[in-house]
Design a protein with these regions (language model features):
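Short secondary-structure boundary segments
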Residues: 38-40, 110-111, 140
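Glycine-rich, Arg-bearing micro-motifs that act as flexible, cationic patches
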Residues: 108-130
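Structural beta-alpha unit
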Residues: 24, 72-106
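A short acidic, glycine-rich active-site loop
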Residues: 53-65
Length: 140
């Protein structure tokens, strides 16, 4: 049923729960592909070249660490696992990947690392739910 699963993560606790759920789904559904995507907002250009490069390097290192942890949580699945690190607004990046990779399902946490912790549904999750062309599973 869900051969192409897209997991959007950001390193939050909710994303960790979504990662476990996506791994379980991929195993149970015998999915062909689980694609794990992490996207971060662009580094502001006003930082200047040396500071900008340092900020980009720090974000890339953090993203790689988050992806490594996600791969451990997912564990062994019957299909392939692909990872992508993207720069740009997270919801837009997830929607773009879902469309271009023809995802059957998007899995993501209900809230991320944003400052509005009291919200029931995070702004990025809400945007994905509103604009996705495939089913979206939001995990708490």
């Amino acid at each position: 049923m869900f051969n192409q699963i897209l997991l959007g993560i950001d390193g939050s606790e909710h994303a960790l729960h979504a990662t476990k759920t996506a791994g379980d789904l991929a195993r149970n559904m015998k999915s062909q592909t689980l694609r794990i995507v992490i996207a971060f907002d662009p580094v502001p250009p006003y930082l200047g070249e040396p500071n900008m490069q340092a900020a980009i390097s720090a974000r890339m290192k953090e993203a790689e660490t988050i992806l490594e942890n996600a791969l451990k949580v997912v564990g062994e699945i019957p299909g392939e696992v692909h990872t992508e690190i993207l720069e740009g607004p997270p919801a837009e990046a997830i929607l773009d990947v879902a469309k271009t990779r023809k995802s059957d399902l998007i899995v993501m946490g209900s809230r991320g690392l944003g400052r509005l912790r009291g919200m029931l549904l995070g702004s990025q999750s809400q945007k994905v739910v509103q604009h996705a062309s495939c089913p979206v599973l939001i995990v708490r």
